[in-house]
């Protein structure tokens, strides 16, 4: 099962429990930090995706699927993602997302639905009654060559969303995160000198003198790059290569 404190965020203190001994160790380690309230979920092996849906009084529209990638266990930090994704059964995912929104009577505005796609189909992780946050709207904007923020504002101004039904992404847009390979104090970051127009955005959150470590949760990440490509694989490879060529120098 998957256990996480109800007062956490950013994938902090998330653990997978496979046995009673795992549970005992977890309770001992979290006891002094948590609020004694936990979310306990079935652990499902599969691929995590995010679906952003716009709903109006007349229809729902799936803007696209964001294919998420995590760092290896025991980390629960996100290594990156790609929007859109063509690696899933889009009609089946769309139908499932719409059924979820119908079940919770969500009928207006943006919603962000996270799922695990397992071998036997998709499983709901959570429903957020808002547009996806963090860097993803920028990522979507580069793929769609339009502002999803503007589209959301127009929805709340009462403008029809019918035109979004035929929205076709111009690019696949991939995010990859820069992280430290070992604990230490950040001295500098050397970014690749020669990049082409496929690199659309680079942002660094950590500064010289900050403590860094290999990623356990999302707050451990140093910065990110967004790259675009004609295919999902191409965009991911460009972003991966940029991260590989970035040097994180520790004191």
Feature-to-residue mapping (PLM):
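Active-site "cap" helix and flanking loop/linker of ATP-utilizing ligase/carboxylase catalytic domains
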Residues: 92-113, 119, 128-184
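A short, flexible beta-alpha/helix-coil linker loop
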Residues: 7-10, 133
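Peripheral (often C-terminal) accessory segments that flank ATP-dependent C-N-forming ligase machineries
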Residues: 153-251
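Short, well-ordered beta-strand elements within core beta-sheets of diverse protein domains
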Residues: 15, 42, 85, 141, ...
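A short linear hydrophobic-aromatic micro-motif
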Residues: 1-3, 36-40, 162-164, 201-203
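Short, flexible turn/loop "capping" segments at secondary-structure junctions
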Residues: 5-7, 74-75, 215-220
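Protein kinase-like catalytic core scaffold
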Residues: 1, 61, 123-126
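Internal nucleotide-binding/catalytic subdomain
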Residues: 7, 14-120
């Amino acid at each position: 099962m998957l256990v996480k404190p109800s007062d956490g965020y950013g994938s902090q203190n998330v653990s997978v429990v496979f046995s009673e001994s795992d549970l005992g160790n977890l309770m001992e380690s979290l006891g002094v930090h948590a609020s004694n309230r936990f979310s306990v979920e079935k652990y499902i092996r599969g691929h995590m995706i995010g679906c952003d849906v716009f709903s109006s009084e007349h229809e729902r529209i799936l803007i696209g699927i964001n294919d998420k990638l995590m760092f290896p266990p025991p980390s629960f930090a996100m290594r990156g993602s790609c929007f859109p994704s063509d690696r899933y059964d889009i009609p089946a995912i769309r139908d499932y997302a719409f059924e979820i929104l119908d079940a919770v009577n969500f009928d207006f505005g943006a919603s962000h639905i996270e799922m695990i796609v397992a071998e036997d189909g998709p499983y709901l992780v959570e429903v957020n009654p808002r547009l996806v946050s963090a860097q993803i709207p920028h990522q979507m904007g580069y793929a769609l060559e339009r502002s999803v923020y503007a589209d959301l504002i127009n929805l709340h101004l009462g403008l029809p969303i019918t035109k979004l039904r035929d929205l076709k992404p111009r690019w696949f847009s991939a995010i990859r995160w820069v992280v430290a390979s070992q604990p230490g104090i950040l001295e500098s970051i050397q970014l690749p000198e020669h990049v082409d127009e496929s690199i659309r955005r680079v942002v660094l959150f950590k500064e010289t003198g900050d403590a860094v470590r290999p990623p356990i949760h999302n707050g451990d990440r140093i910065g990110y790059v967004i790259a675009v490509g004609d295919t999902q694989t191409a965009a991911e490879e460009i972003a991966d290569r940029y991260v590989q060529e970035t040097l994180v120098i520790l004191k």
